[in-house]
UniProtKB/Swiss-Prot annotation:
The UvrABC repair system catalyzes the recognition and processing of DNA lesions. UvrC both incises the 5' and 3' sides of the lesion. The N-terminal half is responsible for the 3' incision and the C-terminal half is responsible for the 5' incision. It holds the Pfam family UvrC_RNaseH_dom. The gene is uvrC. This is UvrABC system protein C. NCBIfam families: PRK00558.1-5, uvrC.
Length: 607
């Protein structure tokens, strides 16, 4: 029952649209809400507890005081509510986790020679902003791609000072040096326009333009410019290929879905422009326990698009959103054109939303694993493993194994080590497969296990190989586990504890047991095993890609007539890598000993 002061405040509430603030006994704002009719909305909280969710009951029990602000419309109330939630971050509101200062990309169009850089604040200063991005890693990656493609200046001066010679950025092909007149103002402005088109998702337009410029440069025998355009074209094609979606999509739209566990929801947003996925971001929402799916999506949409610089004409959501009409009006006003919000419940939109939702679930799982040590103690996870697997002691040392290859080529194996639940990267080991031909993962696992345990008693075993694990984890199911168990038995290690973790259903296989074990999705023990398994996969894949890149680099040079082993070594020594050779100018290639102008031209054309 509300206190007398609170009862009087409720009784005096107006029947206008507005925002209400609920405070506890300490005067802290614990909830902010909006309403078309303030009196009706606030009174709906003070009903018998049986008609409220447990979360709302807890909120009502803490309300000691009410404040309200009248607005001219429900749309104005929505904007005010957003600002108050962002400022006060009330405990009972659904809110973006760590939403203070999401990063943006800024293009300084107010400067003579515009720059592109990362910022955490927006100002009405004539600049163009893109974002927000969920984290600095994704925005840095985007900036790196832009830098490699368009080579804009990155010096901090608003006006680059005149220089007699270019700086290092020019020498390493990261800037076109406007400060020394290496590029005209019109060409530089054209370059920035291409970067904007790229960020808007109009890569096809940029591609057509670059192909035309490459052909024009080639026709006038300007091979250096033609090679630059060719490299840009190849990079953009690679980006476009990575933007294809399994679902058929058209036009411009954002697709939003989430996965929830308790009070935390992970929201995934796919940004689709011209039928291609140009980016995706994940955001954490707090305070979502017992909230309806439509309310969660509505709260996210309000908070995300409040700070977003790009609003598409269509937004597809996992469930029908609450307050759809008022949201559409507000978003249409912000965009300057009509915005439609629709739920992807059937057909092509459902296909798309299913993909987004699967990514949201994966992101939530990774967040759980990442936060394992802070949310539950590793001691509890190890103790649960001991019980679930029937071990005599908690597994103090866990070793994880995985294989990575493509149709048997560049095959490698990995071994990662976790002690007391924490990775020990100094003990990680990698294996290049030597005895197995073709795609035979079982035999590859046997080779890795034989090489690892064959060194246990050798003097040169080292600390990592000299110790036996408390538990071995194999990435795979019954077949992989049987291969490893057979190898261990041959090595006289019949008592070695070993399990397989199959990815599809996260089932745990044990030797001599026909049926797998299934632990709860939020089990600390399962989360620890997933972390070991995923780390083994990451480590193996990284080594595999490294070998593939090395083999790919040498074959690229081998295909150029006149470049034999000695010239290849000299080129690599001079420029550091094939990427460095590819970026080198015609003049610099011609200066390398043994490389005449004709051969330098062949290298530029064929590499």
């Amino acid at each position: 029952m509300p206190n007398e002061t609170l009862q009087n405040q409720i009784a005096s509430l107006p029947e206008n649209p507005g925002v209400y603030l609920m405070k506890n006994a300490q005067g802290e704002i614990i909830y902010v809400g909006k309403a078309a009719v303030l009196k009706d909305r606030v009174k709906s909280y003070f009903v018998p507890p049986s008609r409220l969710t447990p979360k709302t009951c807890q909120l009502v029990s803490q309300i000691n005081e009410l404040e309200y602000l009248i607005t001219g419309s429900e749309q104005e109330a929505l904007i005010l509510e957003l600002n108050l939630i962002k400022r006060h971050r009330p405990y009972f509101n659904v809110r973006l986790k760590d939403d203070k200062g999401f990063p943006y990309l800024k293009i300084t169009l107010n400067e003579k020679w515009p720059r592109i850089y990362i910022t955490r604040s927006m100002a009405d200063d004539g600049g163009r902003y893109f974002g927000p991005f969920a984290n600095t890693r994704s925005v840095r990656h985007t900036l790196q791609v832009l830098k490699e493609l368009f080579r804009f200046r990155s010096c901090n001066r608003t006006e680059p000072e005149k220089r007699s010679r270019p700086c290092l950025e020019y020498d390493i092909h990261q800037c076109l040096s406007p400060c020394t007149g290496k590029i005209s103002k019109s060409d530089y402005d054209h370059l920035i326009s291409q970067a904007i088109l790229f960020l808007e998702g109009k890569q096809d337009q940029v591609l057509k333009l670059l192909i035309r410029l490459m052909n024009e440069a080639s026709a006038r025998l300007d091979y250096e410019t033609a090679a630059l355009r060719r490299d840009q074209i190849a990079s953009i094609k690679e980006v476009i290929e990575g933007q294809q979606l399994a679902a058929r999509v058209t036009g411009e739209q954002d697709a939003i879905a989430f996965a929830q566990e308790g009070d935390l929801s992970m929201v995934q947003v796919f940004f689709i422009r011209r039928g291609k996925l140009i980016g995706r971001e994940s955001f954490c929402l707090q305070g979502t326990r017992e909230e309806k799916p439509g309310d969660i999506l509505s709260e996210f949409a309000k908070q995300f698009y409040h700070s977003s610089t790009q609003i598409p004409p269509k937004i597809v959501t996992q469930y029908p959103v609450s307050d759809r009409e008022i949201l559409e009006k507000w978003l249409s006003q912000r965009r300057g054109d009509k915005v439609h919000i629709t739920a992807g419940l059937r057909g092509q939109p459902k296909e798309l939303i299913n993909i987004v939702a699967e990514n949201a679930r994966e992101q939530l799982k990774q967040a759980r694993i990442k936060n394992l040590s802070s949310s539950v103690t590793l001691t509890d996870a190890l103790a649960e493993l001991q019980t679930a697997l029937g071990l005599s002691l908690p597994p103090q040392r866990i070793e994880g194994y995985d294989i990575s290859n493509i149709q048997g080529t560049n095959a490698v194996g990995s071994m990662v080590v976790f002690e007391n639940g924490k990775p020990q990267k100094a003990h990680y080991r990698r294996f290049r497969i030597k005895t197995v031909k073709g795609a035979d993962d079982f035999s590859m696992l046997k080779e890795v296990i034989s090489r690892r345990f064959g060194r246990v008693h050798r003097e040169d075993a080292g600390e990592s190989f000299a110790r036996l694990p408390s538990l071995m984890l194999i990435d795979g199911g019954k077949g992989q586990l049987s291969s490893v168990k057979e190898t261990l038995d041959k090595l006289g290690l019949e008592g070695q504890a070993v399990i397989g973790l199959a990815k599809e259903f996260e089932e745990i296989y044990l030797p001599h047991k026909s049926e797998p074990i299934r632990l709860a999705a939020n089990s600390p023990a399962l989360q620890l095993l997933q972390r070991v398994r995923d780390e083994a996969h990451r480590f193996a894949l990284g080594y595999h890609l490294h070998i593939r890149q090395k083999s790919g680099l040498t074959s690229a040079l081998d295909g150029i007539p006149g470049v034999g082993p000695s010239r290849r070594r000299l080129l690599i020594k001079t420029f550091g890598s094939v990427a460095g050779i590819r970026q080198a100018s015609f003049e610099k290639l011609s200066q390398v000993k043994g490389i005449n102008q004709a051969l330098a031209l062949s290298i530029k054309e064929l590499l």
